[in-house]
C-alpha cells in the first residue's frame, strides 16, 4: 500500500506540468464486422441499440421487439445460451453457429459480432489493432484550445445597412481581434446565401483568423475533429469532440497499401518501379481514410460537412505518400525526404472527403526515419515538458523506435527489431486482431490466455508472445539461452504435456485443435523464441547505447512509456523478464496506447502543441546505431534472457499489478 | 517657355515622392486582326518580321524573300503604293482591297492589318481600347520589388549528405532569412525530380517566403508577370518584365460577358434570373483572360509555366464574378458585396491557365460601387503619397467615378454619367476601336480627325465627341445652351455645308459617305449633344459637390488625372471647354492611360503597393450624391456649356499643348 501511495505522489509530481492522465473507464467495446466498427457502448446495451446510430443496417419488421426474427447477427465471441425468443425464431444450426438476434443480445463484455452470415477471412483482416485498449492522454476541459473554434453570432441589422461586405459584417460581429479575418474562396462562394438563410444569426467556424464556414446557430455546439494514425499495416481514425476532448468513435482498417508490399521498403520499391506507383498508393490510403471517416461520422450521427479539421501522423514515408510527395529519396543516399516541416493543406486537395474548407495538418518529421508517429509519441509522453526527469520511450512495431532524455536533451535511435514483435515471422504469429492471444498468465498450474474479441485463439500476436515467453522463462521451460527444454521433474508439471518434441527440437503447444478457433493447433516453436531473442536483443542494445551516450544508469530512468502495436498491450513485467527493458521498477512502466493518434489528438485539441511538435523535430538528436561498435557488442550480449529466480506463481500477481 | 519650365519644376516637386512618370516613346503600334494583337515594333520594321515572335502564322514558301507571294495580309490603315514585287505577285483586285505581302510591308505609322482575307465585323469587335496610347507610370529599376522574385542557387553538396529534406536544402541555400520557407503541395510534388534534374544548381521562384518552383538556372532572368484590367466591356491584359518594369506586350478583347448584358446592371439581372448564371459569366471571363494570356505569352516567346503571378483589377462586380462570388448583393439593399478585402488565391483555383503554383492577386475594393479599378486609378495618381496637394481624378467610363483630395483626406463619388462618354446612345457613337474618331481639331478653317488605326472613320467615340463639341462651341456652331445653330455669317464658314437641317433640327455632318469607311455618313445630332450635356453636367456637379465638401475652390486643385475609356484620349482643353472639368490651368491635366491596369502593375512591380491599396480602401470616404440637394442644383446649373470667347484658331494649339 505504501508503495502505491508513493507511486501516486510521484506520478502526480511528474504530471504536474502536464495535462493529467486519465484512462477512460466504463462501458465495453463492440466490434462490428465486416465494417470493423468499434463502438464504445454501455454495459448491458443491446447490439440493436448500439447499431441504431451507425450506418450498419439490420433487417427488421418488428422494430426491435424480438418478434420478427430478422435482425440476425453472428456473435464471434463467447456467448451465453439463447433467449426464449431466439429459440423460437432461430433454428438449431443457426444457434450453434452463434447466430443471434441483435435486439435480444445484450453486451456485458467486449464482443465481436458479424452482420454478414458468410464470414470471409478477408473481412477479418479489417481488424482494429489498437483501440480495444484505450488509454489516451486526457486534457482537462479548461485547457482545451482546439484547432477549430466556433462562435455563435447575431450580426446586428444596423451593421448591414451601409453596404458592408458579408465578410466585414462577420468581422464586426467577432470583434476587433478579428480585423484581419480571411476566408478561403469556397467559403466566400456560399457565404451570401448562408447569411441570407440564417438571417444573419449563425455560427462562425474559425481556424485561427480564417473563416471556414457560416452555419446555423444550432451547429455551434457540434464541434468535432479527426485524427488519423497512418500505420504501415493499419490505419486508425478517431473522432474527437471539442466540447470535452473526449474520443467519440474509433475505426481502423488494414492499410490497403499492404497489397503493394507489407512494409515501407517494399512500398518504396513499388513506387520506384512503377511510374504511377506513388499515385496508386496515395489513392489507396486516401480511400481507406475516407472509409474510416465515413464509419466514424455515421457512428456519431455526423456528416462530412461537419468536419473542418483532421490531423494525420505516420512515419515519414506514409506521410509523404498521403501528400503525394515522392518518398523515394528517403531510401537512397543522400536519404532526403522532400519535406520535414509540418504541413497544413486543404483536406480536399489531398482527396479527403470532409467539409470543402476543411484543413489537414500533417505532422512534422525529423528525417526520413524519424517520422510524425515518433514525434507524436514524444508529445504524448510529455517528455518535452520535463526538465528534470529522464524518460524512456519505446515504439515497438516492425522497427523499434527508441527515445531517451528530457526537455534538456533528447536522443533517439532506430533498431531493426524485426517483425517478430508484430507477430510476423512467428509460426502462428498474427497481428493483434480478433482471435489473437494478446496476453498470457500462469495461475494455479494452468496457462490462461486473453484473446482479442473473447473468441477462441487463432494465433498469437506480439504482446502474447512476449508474455508467453516470460511465463515459460519463469516456469523454467525456456532457459536463459532461449532453449525450450524437455519436461523436467518438479518444473511446471501441469504444462509437460504441452512440450512437444518435433525432430529433436522442442516446441510448446499453446492451443490444441480442440482449444483453437479453427481446430488447428497453435504452437510456439524454438525458432519463434530465436526470432524474439533477436528482436529484444536489438532493442535492449539500443536502449543501453542511448543510456551510455546520455551518461545514465537504469536507476536514473524516471518513466518508461510503451507504444506501438506491441507496446500497447504487453505486460510491463514480461518486457522486463525477457530483458527487452532494463530492470526498472515495474511501476514506472506505462503503455500510452496508440501514441501516434494520441499525439495527433493533442495537437487537435490544444493547438500550441503544433508548435511544440515543430520545435521537437529540431530539438531531438538522432543516434545512428548501424555503424557503432558498442551497439553491436550490446546486441550480442542482450540476446540471452536475463537471470531471474522469480517463482511462477508470482507472475500472475505481477502481471495484474 | 518660362511657363513650361515652371511646370516641369512643379511636376518634379509633385513626383518627388513618387516613382517618376515616363511616357514610352519610340516605335509604332501594329494591330493584328482578327487576333487583336497589339505589337509595339520599331519604326520601319516589316509586318513579316513583327509577326515572327508571335503565334500568328503566315503562309510562306520563300521565307520572307518576297518571291512566293503567299504571305498575304490585308492592310486596313492608309497605305502607300505597292512594291514592284507586290505588283507582280498580287492581282489588281487584291491591291485595291489593300492586300499586301507581309514581308514587303514596312510599318512607319500605327497600322491595323488583318491576317484573314474575310474581314468579319465580329472580329472587329475584338479591338484594343486602350493601348494604342500608352502612358504608364514608370518605375525606376532600383525601386522594383516585384511580387515574385527569383534566386539562382547552387546547393552545396555537403548540405545534401545528411538526410536533409529537399525543402530544407533550399532554405539553407537561400540563407537564414528564409528559415520559415514554405511551399505549396504542387511545388513539393515535383521538387525531388527537379532537384535531381538540375543537379541542385537551379533557380528558386519565390513569393514572399513561399517557394513556388525550382527551375533550371537559365530561367533565373526570365521574370514576368501579368496584369488584367477587368473592364465591363473590354478586357485588357498586359505582360510586364520584372527586369526593368517594362510593358512587354498588351492584348485586349471584348468582354464575352457582353453577350449576357452590356452593362453591370443587366449582368446582375442575368445572374439573379439564371441558376447557373454566375458560373456561366465566370467561365466567359476566365476563357477571355486565358486567351489574352496565350496571346501575350506567345508574342513574347513565353509559356504558361513561365508566369507565376497575375494582378487583376476591375469594378466590384467584375472582380466578384471572376472569383465566382455572387455579386447580387451589390444590387439590392443592403448593397453588400461578399468581400471588400483584396484576395490572393491560387490562379488555377480560379481557372486561369498559368504555372500550377501561380498566384492571382485581386484588388481590394471600397464597396459595391467603388471597385478595384478606381483604387488602381488612385494608386496610379499617387494621391496617397501626397500630403499637401489636392488631386482630382476622373474615371470617365459608363459611370463617372470621381475622387478629390490628398493623403490627408480623400473623397469619392460616383455619377451616373450615362453611356454617352463611351460612345453609346450617340447616333454614330462607338467604343474606342479601329475606325473611331478619337480626336478632332480645327485648323485653317478645316476639321481634322484622328481615327484609331489610321483608317477612314466609321463613327465617333467618347473622346472624339468631347473634342468635336468643344470645337463646335469654339466655332460658334453650338451655342451655350447646346443648340446646333443654323449657319451664321462670319462663323466658321468652311463648315456651313456640314450643318444639315433635318425636320427642323440641325445635325452636324462629321463625315460624308465619301469620307467614311463604309460609305455611310457620320453625323453628330442635336440629340447627341443633349446626351453629352447630361453626362458632363453630372460629372461637373459631382466635382463641385466634392470641392464644397472638402472646402476648396478650383484654384486649389493641384493636379487633374483622367482615366477610363474616355479619359485616356480626350484632349484636356476640350474637357474644360465643354465644362466637364472646372476651369483649371490646362497644364495640370494629364491622362493616366489605362489606370486600372497601371495601378495593378504598380502592385505587381512594387509589392508594398498591395498594402497601400488595402489602406486606401479603408481611408477613402464615399459621398453618396443621389440624395443631395446641392448635387441636384449643380447638375441643373452645369448642363449648359460655359461661356468662353476663345477663337477657333487657337484650339489646335491648345490641343497639342
Ligand atoms: S428486430 Fe425483429 S427480432 Fe430483432
Ligand atoms: S513570304 Fe514569300 S512573299 Fe512574303
Regions found by a protein language model. Give the residues of each.
Chain A
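Catalytic cores of nucleotide-enabled group-transfer and carboxylate-activating enzymes in metabolic
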Residues: 27, 50-52, 248, 260-264
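Gly/Thr-rich phosphate-binding beta-strand-loop-beta motif of the actin/hexokinase/Hsp70
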Residues: 214-257, 390-406, 570
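Short acidic-glycine loop/turn motifs at beta-strand connectors
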Residues: 34-35, 76-78, 107-109, 241-244, ...
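Short, contiguous acidic and Ser/Thr-rich linear segments
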Residues: 35-45
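Local cysteine-cluster metal-coordination motifs and their immediate loop/turn environment
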Residues: 57-79, 92-109
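Helical "lid/coupling" subdomains associated with nucleotide-phosphate turnover
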Residues: 262-302, 306-309, 318-395, 401-657
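Nucleotide/phosphate-binding catalytic cleft detector across ATP-hydrolyzing
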Residues: 2-20, 25-28, 89-227, 232, ...
Amino acid at each position: 500500500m505504501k508503495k502505491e501511495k508513493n507511486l501516486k505522489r510521484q506520478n502526480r509530481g511528474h504530471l504536474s506540468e502536464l495535462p493529467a492522465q486519465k484512462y477512460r473507464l466504463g462501458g465495453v467495446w463492440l466490434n462490428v464486422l465486416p465494417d470493423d466498427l468499434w463502438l464504445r457502448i454501455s454495459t448491458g446495451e443491446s447490439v440493436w441499440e448500439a447499431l441504431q446510430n451507425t450506418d450498419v443496417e439490420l433487417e427488421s419488421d418488428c422494430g426491435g421487439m424480438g418478434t420478427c426474427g430478422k435482425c440476425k447477427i453472428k456473435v464471434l465471441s463467447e456467448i451465453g445460451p439463447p433467449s426464449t425468443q431466439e429459440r423460437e425464431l432461430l433454428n438449431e444450426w443457426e444457434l450453434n453457429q452463434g447466430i443471434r438476434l441483435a435486439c435480444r443480445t445484450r453486451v456485458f463484455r467486449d464482443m465481436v459480432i458479424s452482420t454478414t452470415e458468410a464470414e470471409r477471412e478477408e473481412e477479418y483482416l479489417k481488424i482494429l489493432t489498437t483501440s480495444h485498449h484505450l488509454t489516451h492522454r486526457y486534457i482537462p476541459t479548461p485547457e482545451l484550445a482546439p484547432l477549430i473554434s466556433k462562435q455563435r453570432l447575431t450580426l446586428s441589422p444596423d451593421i448591414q445597412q451601409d453596404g458592408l461586405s458579408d465578410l466585414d459584417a462577420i468581422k464586426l460581429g467577432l470583434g476587433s481581434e478579428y480585423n484581419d479575418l480571411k476566408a478561403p474562396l469556397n467559403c466566400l462562394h456560399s457565404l451570401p446565401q448562408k447569411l441570407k438563410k440564417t438571417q444573419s444569426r449563425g455560427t462562425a467556424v474559425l481556424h485561427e483568423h480564417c473563416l471556414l464556414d457560416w452555419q446555423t446557430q444550432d451547429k455551434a455546439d457540434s464541434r468535432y475533429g479527426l485524427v488519423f494514425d497512418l500505420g504501415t499495416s493499419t490505419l486508425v481514425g478517431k473522432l474527437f469532440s471539442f466540447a470535452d476532448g473526449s474520443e467519440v468513435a474509433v475505426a481502423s482498417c488494414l492499410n490497403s497499401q499492404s497489397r503493394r508490399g507489407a512494409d515501407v521498403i517494399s512500398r518504396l520499391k513499388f513506387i520506384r518501379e512503377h511510374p504511377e506507383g506513388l499515385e496508386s498508393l496515395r489513392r489507396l490510403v486516401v480511400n481507406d481514410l475516407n472509409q474510416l471517416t465515413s464509419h466514424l461520422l455515421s457512428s456519431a450521427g455526423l456528416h462530412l460537412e461537419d468536419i473542418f479539421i483532421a490531423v494525420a501522423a505516420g512515419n515519414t514515408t506514409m506521410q509523404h505518400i498521403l501528400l503525394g510527395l515522392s518518398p523515394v529519396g528517403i531510401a537512397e543516399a543522400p536519404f532526403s525526404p522532400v519535406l520535414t516541416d509540418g504541413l497544413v493543406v486543404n483536406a480536399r486537395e489531398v482527396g479527403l472527403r470532409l467539409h470543402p474548407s476543411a484543413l489537414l495538418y500533417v505532422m512534422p518529421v525529423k528525417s526520413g526515419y524519424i517520422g510524425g508517429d515518433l514525434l507524436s509519441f514524444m508529445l504524448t509522453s510529455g517528455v518535452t515538458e520535463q526538465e528534470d526527469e529522464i524518460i524512456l520511450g519505446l515504439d515497438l512495431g516492425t522497427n523499434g523506435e527508441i527515445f531517451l532524455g528530457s526537455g534538456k536533451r533528447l536522443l533517439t535511435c532506430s533498431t531493426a527489431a524485426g517483425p517478430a514483435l508484430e507477430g510476423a515471422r512467428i509460426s502462428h504469429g498474427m497481428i493483434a486482431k480478433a482471435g489473437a492471444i494478446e496476453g498470457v498468465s500462469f495461475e494455479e498450474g494452468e496457462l490462461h490466455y486473453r484473446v482479442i474479441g473473447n473468441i477462441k485463439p487463432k494465433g498469437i500476436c506480439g504482446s502474447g508472445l512476449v508474455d508467453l515467453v516470460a511465463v515459460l522463462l519463469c516456469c523454467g521451460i525456456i532457459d536463459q539461452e532461449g532453449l525450450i527444454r524437455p519436461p523436467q521433474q518438479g518444473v511446471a508439471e501441469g504444462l509437460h504435456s504441452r512440450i512437444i518434441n518435433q525432430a529433436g527440437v522442442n516446441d510448446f503447444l499453446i492451443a490444441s485443435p480442440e482449444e483453437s478457433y479453427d481446430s488447428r493447433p497453435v504452437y510456439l516453436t524454438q525458432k519463434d523464441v530465436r526470432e524474439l531473442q533477436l528482436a529484444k536483443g536489438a532493442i535492449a542494445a539500443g536502449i543501453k547505447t542511448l543510456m551510455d551516450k546520455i551518461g545514465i544508469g537504469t536507476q536514473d530512468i524516471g518513466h518508461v512509456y510503451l507504444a506501438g502495436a506491441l507496446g500497447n498491450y504487453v505486460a510491463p513485467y514480461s518486457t522486463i523478464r525477457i530483458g527487452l527493458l532494463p530492470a526498472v521498477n515495474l511501476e514506472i512502466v506505462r503503455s500510452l496506447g496508440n501514441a501516434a493518434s494520441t499525439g495527433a489528438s493533442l495537437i487537435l485539441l490544444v493547438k500550441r502543441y503544433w508548435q511544440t511538435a515543430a520545435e521537437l523535430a529540431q530539438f531531438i538528436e538522432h543516434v545512428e546505431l548501424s555503424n557503432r561498435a558498442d551497439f553491436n557488442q550490446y546486441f550480442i550480449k542482450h540476446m540471452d534472457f536475463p537471470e531471474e529466480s522469480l517463482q511462477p506463481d508470482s507472475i500472475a500477481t505481477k502481471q495484474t499489478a
